[in-house]
């Protein structure tokens, strides 16, 4: 096993500079949409439960789509607030993202030395998907941090500590359990240590997500439901290519040409097959295989592969030079994405207009990803998707009949439905029918489709 030497002052200074760049990319835009949770709908599932944890709600979230580590990490940030604070939660998210950059540096140095550490840290710093999700109080960057740290411990030969880290990674998000494979690979011939590491992994998971085990039946139901939805597909991915190519595209969108240098590093690792190579290749292989049944091709699903590809891209001086040059492309993309986040979200204007003009007793129907579900009078329409039943409330006559007087729609659902109208004919008819109605309010911003572009409020009652 290759063990990295103690970092020099120059190397630590370089890491500090990289972390400063990473912080700048992540802090700018982290306040987008606040005080509403508009960056990612999963924040509505996670932050309120973290708030309840420190305000008398108990340790059992009663919801097991995800395990509990992120609730524990976010909980202290919610102390002192009378309601869930998405801004405070995002401060924690940014800190987790920066820790992920440092972990990539650690993994690279432990596996291949200084060049790999440098490229690993730079690559994760500029990777568009890592930058974006480091601003959101969701599980994916915490999972990636756990995976990267586990791999660093494995290539350093510290199997027992790697077991603890693997258990924490699985407690961040269930795919962390796949770390069992590289753990076994790293421990070939040292089976007693492997058994101890696996026991410590299980213990770390149980300690931090105990109610997943206590309520194993309910947890399995939630996990199975999430898996079925991911395997069925999702709104917006209907015209994607086959899954391997779709996730290759997501990787390119995150790393650009740096991903190609990473593939060269993979080829070198396949040829040389050192212990570090085998650890990283085994994780890359098992994680990639786990994505094959998935038809919901979210960019966040490739996040755990990003640090590994970046480290492999730096495993030698020539590769590292090419990788650092290639990193300029995702750096530019991330800066451009960050600039887009500085524009005002039109959903904030819609929420303010509703607060001023819609009577408090009027009930409101809203598409997902338009308004948060906090107001009691708001009724969330179901998200269309493959193998999902049509929501009968997507009919103006039905909305009127059930007493819903206002309707909020946005491009996040409507434009995707209309783009896939052959898959969602009834939903598409509903959105086309709205073209005959003058909206009571419309907020729009110019720009590309990386951010919400418009939201409309319709008066449903005659």
Predicted regions and their residues:
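Transmembrane-helix signature of polytopic, membrane-embedded enzymes
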Residues: 14-19, 104-126, 145, 159-161, ...
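Aromatic/acidic, Gly/Pro-rich catalytic loop(s) in extracytoplasmic/lumenal soluble domains
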Residues: 390, 394-462
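Hydrophobic/aromatic-rich transmembrane helices and adjacent perimembrane loops
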Residues: 133-134, 140-143, 169, 174, ...
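Transmembrane alpha-helical segments
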Residues: 27, 322-344, 366-380
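Transmembrane-helix motifs of polytopic, lipid-linked glycan transferases
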Residues: 88-111, 149
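Specific aromatic-rich, kink-prone transmembrane helix
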Residues: 103, 122, 142-165, 308-312
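Transmembrane-lumen/periplasm boundary regions of multi-pass, lipid-linked membrane glycan transferases
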Residues: 45-49, 66, 72, 82, ...
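Transmembrane alpha-helix segments characteristic
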Residues: 17-23, 260-264, 271-293, 307, ...
């Amino acid at each position: 096993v290759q063990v990295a030497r103690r970092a020099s002052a120059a190397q630590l200074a370089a890491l500090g500079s990289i972390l400063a760049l990473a912080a700048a990319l992540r802090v700018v835009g982290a306040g987008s949409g606040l005080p509403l949770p508009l960056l990612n709908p999963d924040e509505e599932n996670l932050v309120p439960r973290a708030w309840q944890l420190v305000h008398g709600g108990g340790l059992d979230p009663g919801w097991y789509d995800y395990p509990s580590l992120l609730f524990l990490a976010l909980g202290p940030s919610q102390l002192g607030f009378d309601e869930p604070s998405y801004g405070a939660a995002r401060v924690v998210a940014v800190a987790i993202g920066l820790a992920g950059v440092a972990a990539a540096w650690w993994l690279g140095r432990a596996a291949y030395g200084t060049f790999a550490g440098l490229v690993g840290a730079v690559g994760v710093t500029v990777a568009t998907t890592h930058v974006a999700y480091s601003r959101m109080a969701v599980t994916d960057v915490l999972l990636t941090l756990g995976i990267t740290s586990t791999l660093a411990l494995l290539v350093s030969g510290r199997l027992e500590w790697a077991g603890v880290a693997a258990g924490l990674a699985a407690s961040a998000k269930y795919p962390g359990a796949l770390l069992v494979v590289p753990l076994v690979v790293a421990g070939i011939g040292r089976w007693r240590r492997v058994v101890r590491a696996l026991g410590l992994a299980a213990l770390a998971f149980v300690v931090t997500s105990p109610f997943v085990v206590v309520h194993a039946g309910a947890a399995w139901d939630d996990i199975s439901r999430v898996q079925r939805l991911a395997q069925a597909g999702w709104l917006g991915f209907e015209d994607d290519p086959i899954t391997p190519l779709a996730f290759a595209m997501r990787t390119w969108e995150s790393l650009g040409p740096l991903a190609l240098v990473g593939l060269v590093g993979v080829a070198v690792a396949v040829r040389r097959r050192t212990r570090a190579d085998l650890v990283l290749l085994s994780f890359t292989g098992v994680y990639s295989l786990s994505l094959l049944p998935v038809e919901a091709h979210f960019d966040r699903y490739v996040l755990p592969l990003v640090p590994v590809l970046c480290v492999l891209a730096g495993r030698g001086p020539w590769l590292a030079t090419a990788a650092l040059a290639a990193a300029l492309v995702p750096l530019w993309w991330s800066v451009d994405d960050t600039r887009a986040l500085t524009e005002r979200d039109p959903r904030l204007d819609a929420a303010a207009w509703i607060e001023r003009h819609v009577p408090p007793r009027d009930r409101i129907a809203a598409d997902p990803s338009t308004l948060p579900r906090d107001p009691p009078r708001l009724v969330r329409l179901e998200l269309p998707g493959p193998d999902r039943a049509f929501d009968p409330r997507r009919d103006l006559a039905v909305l009127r009949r059930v007493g819903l007087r206002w309707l909020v729609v946005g491009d996040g659902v409507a434009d995707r439905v209309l783009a896939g109208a052959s898959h969602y004919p009834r939903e598409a008819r509903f959105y086309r029918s709205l073209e005959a109605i003058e909206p009571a309010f419309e907020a729009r911003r110019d720009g590309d489709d990386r951010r919400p572009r418009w939201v409309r409020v319709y008066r449903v009652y005659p």
